[in-house]
């Protein structure tokens, strides 16, 4: 018999009642407290079908795992959908969905019944292996299976981006919708973010089959070099490179030829002309603003509520859940949630801790404040990391505000370390950990290692210490100024907390959550910035009795 935890028993009826009364439920429950199982149970009490919306494919597994526990009593079917790059038989690493020319593929209409009796990622591997042998399409087979399953899982784009949601064509009103890791909704606009770099254009020139295309791309490359800057912050660009309608059509014809040829060869790689076309297509909409960032031209839509407006549809039953949800007012003002909301903080509701614990230490002789940054400060931070590493019982997760600061500090350290990059993977990190007794893991706030990893062995956390190097405030750049203007209009006042403190607080809590994934986990949290001494940080990070320290 499935036994519920104390908080699940106490809040189950309250959540079900809220959902039946058409409230959007916001559930703030610590990592490892059983949110997934709880949301499954309450959802199936309200509606016969459940849609889980998650950030990454890796997050399909907890749904499959917990559904297996329920299946012992109820015959509930499960399915999921991964993107074409992950399921197409001919897609190579790096290919984008639009690069894959399904309309020319003879397997598009060849589908098989999919039975999800294995973990999702293992099933995808099996489907791809069988698909090559038996000549069927894994992607369209998975898509077809969605319409027959009781519980389905999709990644964010299939829910928040109109064209992808319309493509899968399911009636959302039939489902109880559970949006997991909902603190990430702060970055939902990044799903459509596009960038243009010298490397992209140079690779497009190499791939191009047309002399005319190469001429257009060479001109574009020269224009790009005139407007991009090396700074690791968003700087608004006024004179954006332009392509005429005729030039875009020439590139589009070239792109289509490359797509056809790649399918004929049985290898669909990333087609860089497609990236350029999608960049200009989005730019033409008008709601995207161009910025220079680290030698790239980036277009962003700063209106987060544009993507989240679907949450206000009163015909939809929705649970938002996370271990680090922002406050209710933030969700209403910044995210634009206007419908009735039942906001539940589990530990406050039951007046009891349901997560692991940690000891806090504040370094009062360092800071990442802009006017205090120097080589001497980076050396101090490196000395702190050495000190922390040698007393640590296991691996040390270090979270930096930016790649620049991470490079300046970690380059001074010769200990066993793994430093996050664009190509970082959990597999590589595990290899580094298994090769050493303990490792300094360098990560950037909101990056894949500070939020997306779970390092455990035999139900024991492999991280004993979490170090926050400076406060991970967003940089005061042109993008933040635009956000500030929009938030001020919504609130009729400026709000430092909403712009700076709450996003940084969520980032820090997520990092701490990497080490305490279970109620029995314990870790040390090192807050290396003298600004953490303020009551705001000590209260919100539950560090009122923090130990102060100096080198």
Swiss-Prot record:
Reactions mediated catalytically: Couples ATP hydrolysis with the unwinding of duplex DNA at the replication fork by translocating in the 5'-3' direction. This creates two antiparallel DNA single strands (ssDNA). The leading ssDNA polymer is the template for DNA polymerase III holoenzyme which synthesizes a continuous strand; ATP + H2O = ADP + phosphate + H(+)
Keyword check for Iron: yes
Signal peptide: none
Keywords: 4Fe-4S, ATP-binding, DNA damage, DNA repair, DNA-binding, Helicase, Hydrolase, Iron, Iron-sulfur, Isomerase, Metal-binding, Nucleotide-binding, Transcription
GO BP terms: DNA repair
Cofactor binding summary note: Binds 1 [4Fe-4S] cluster.
Cofactors, names only: [4Fe-4S] cluster
Lineage: Archaea, Thermoproteota, Thermoprotei, Sulfolobales, Sulfolobaceae
Domain of life: Archaea
Protein name as annotated: ATP-dependent DNA helicase XPD
All copies of domain Helicase ATP-binding, residue ranges: 1-228
Documented effect of changing residue 136 to P: Impairs [4Fe-4S]-binding and helicase activity
Family the entry assigns: Belongs to the helicase family. RAD3/XPD subfamily.
EC number(s) reported in the record: 5.6.2.3
């Amino acid at each position: 018999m499935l036994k519920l935890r104390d908080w699940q028993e106490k809040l189950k009826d309250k959540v079900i009642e809220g959902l039946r009364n058409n409230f959007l439920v916001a559930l703030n429950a610590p990592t490892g407290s059983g949110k997934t199982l709880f949301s499954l149970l309450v959802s199936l009490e309200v509606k016969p079908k459940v849609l889980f919306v998650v950030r990454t494919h890796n997050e399909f597994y907890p749904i499959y795992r917990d559904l297996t526990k329920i299946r012992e009593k109820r015959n509930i079917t499960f399915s999921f959908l991964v993107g074409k790059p992950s399921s197409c038989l001919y897609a190579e690493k790096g290919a984008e969905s639009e690069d894959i020319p399904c309309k020319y593929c003879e397997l598009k209409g060849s589908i098989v019944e999919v039975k999800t009796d294995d973990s999702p990622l293992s099933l995808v591997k099996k489907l791809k292996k069988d698909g090559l042998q038996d000549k069927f399409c894994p992607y369209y087979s998975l898509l077809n299976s969605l319409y027959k399953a009781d519980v389905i899982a999709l990644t964010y784009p299939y829910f928040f981006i109109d064209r992808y949601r319309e493509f899968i064509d399911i009636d959302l009103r039939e489902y109880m919708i559970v949006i997991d890791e909902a603190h990430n909704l702060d970055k939902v606009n990044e799903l459509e973010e596009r960038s243009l770099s010298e490397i992209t254009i140079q690779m497009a020139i190499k791939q191009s089959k047309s002399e005319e295309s190469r001429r257009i791309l060479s001109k574009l490359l020269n224009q790009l070099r005139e407007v991009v800057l090396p700074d690791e912050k968003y700087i608004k660009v006024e004179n954006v490179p332009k392509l005429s309608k005729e030039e875009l059509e020439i590139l589009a014809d070239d792109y289509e030829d490359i797509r056809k040829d790649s399918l004929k060869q049985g290898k669909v790689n990333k087609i860089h002309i497609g990236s350029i076309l999608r960049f200009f297509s989005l730019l033409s909409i008008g709601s995207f603003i161009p910025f220079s960032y680290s030698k790239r031209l980036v277009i962003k839509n700063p209106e987060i509520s544009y993507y989240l407006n679907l949450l206000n549809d009163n015909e939809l039953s929705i649970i938002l859940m996370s271990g680090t949800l922002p406050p209710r007012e933030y969700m209403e003002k910044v995210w634009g949630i206007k419908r009735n909301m039942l906001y539940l903080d589990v530990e406050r509701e039951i007046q009891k801790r349901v997560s692991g614990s940690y000891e806090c230490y504040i370094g009062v002789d360092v800071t990442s404040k802009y006017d205090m940054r120097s080589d001497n400060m980076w050396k101090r931070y490196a000395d702190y990391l050495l000190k922390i590493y040698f007393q640590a019982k296991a691996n040390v997760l270090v979270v930096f505000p930016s790649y620049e600061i991470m490079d300046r500090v970690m380059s001074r350290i010769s200990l066993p370390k793994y430093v996050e990059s664009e190509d970082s993977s959990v597999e590589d990190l595990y290899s580094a950990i298994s090769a050493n007794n303990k490792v300094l893991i360098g990560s950037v706030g909101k990056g894949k290692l500070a939020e997306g990893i779970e390092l455990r062995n035999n139900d024991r956390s492999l991280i004993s210490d979490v170090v926050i190097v400076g406060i991970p405030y967003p940089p005061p750049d042109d993008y933040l100024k635009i956000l500030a203007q929009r938030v001020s209009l919504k609130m009729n006042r400026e709000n430092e907390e909403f712009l700076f403190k709450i996003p940084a607080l969520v980032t820090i809590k997520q990092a701490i959550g990497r080490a305490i994934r279970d109620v029995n986990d314990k870790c040390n949290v090192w807050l290396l910035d003298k600004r953490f001494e303020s009551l705001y940080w000590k209260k919100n990070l539950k560090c009122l009795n923090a130990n102060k320290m100096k080198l």
